[in-house]
Regions:
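Protein kinase glycine-rich loop
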Residues: 29-33
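A conserved alpha-helical element in kinase catalytic cores
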Residues: 51-98, 116-130
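Protein kinase-like catalytic domain
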Residues: 85, 132-136, 209, 228-231
Length: 258
């Protein structure tokens, strides 16, 4: 992966994504950049410009969990933002996608999140159940093809024996926990669709219940009830996914104590 892009490079990517040659970058603050991608919160000006937006850049060398490469992953993310909101999945508004050579970027509306309330996890569980109730036929052919080619997220330290058989595959977000679920005044907004694939729905629900440290029993139970109100779930696989997470956290505690 080449060096960190300068402001001129960021501005050029914004212009390509938004289709606005007169757009001018006023400021760009790093925001995340996990898994080898680069993300900035940007302030821009120019006729018709959105004012504040987010740019995410994909380059060779990023952690390509889905196996689609920079362009395929960015395209999948952009299409997911454009399509899923029409199916009851709240996402940031996609402002554009662009690629050049072996690099790609997407621009999206900035989402200002607030602290989670006691009911945020349950709300997120209901949205997750809606996602799991969708089928690839609900997606555009291009997005469905990218999703079907994606390797589902699965790797986790602490995986335990006794995995039950997988009864169904559904659309799977792949990284569904507080870091990618923004609480807003209008409800939640689900971020970061790089790992969207066909996989185990209980991976997602287990992630929501266990990937954040310190989720209490009442909060987790409320989330399970909210999910169950929308669709049935595999209790055996959910128990196994949660057991895997508990093994992971036990390992983390031991590691932190050293």
């Amino acid at each position: 992966m080449t060096g960190e892009p300068d402001s001129g490079t960021i501005q050029e990517w914004l212009r390509r994504c938004c289709g606005h040659a007169g757009l001018r970058l006023l400021s760009a603050s790093p925001a995340g950049g996990y898994s080898g991608t680069r993300t900035w919160e940007c302030e821009v000006t120019g006729a018709g410009s959105p004012g504040h937006l987010v740019l995410k850049l994909y380059r060779p060398g990023f952690d390509d969990y889905s196996g689609l490469g920079p362009i395929g992953t960015a395209c999948k993310h952009a299409l997911a933002l454009a399509e899923l909101s029409g199916h009851g999945i709240p996402t940031p508004r996609c402002l554009g996608f662009a690629s050049t050579g072996d690099e790609a970027a997407i621009a999206m509306a900035r989402v200002v999140g607030s602290e989670w309330s006691g009911g945020t996890r349950a709300e997120a569980a209901g949205v997750l159940a809606t996602l799991h109730g969708m089928r690839t036929g609900d997606l555009s052919p291009e997005l469905a093809e990218l999703v079907s080619r994606s390797t589902p997220n699965r790797g986790r330290v602490g995986e335990t024996a006794g995995e039950p058989p997988l009864a169904e595959e559904t659309l799977q977000h792949g990284d569904y926990f507080s870091a990618n679920i923004a609480a807003t005044g209008k409800g939640i907004c689900v971020l970061d669709w790089d790992l969207l694939a066909l996989g185990d729905p209980m991976w997602d629900l287990g992630f929501l219940l266990e990937a954040d440290r310190g989720v209490d029993v009442e909060e987790a139970s409320g989330a399970i009830r909210a999910y169950r109100a929308v669709r049935a779930f595999d209790k055996g696989r959910l128990r196994w996914q949660r057991a895997c997470w508990r093994a992971y956290w036990r390992g983390r505690r031991l590691s932190d104590a050293v």
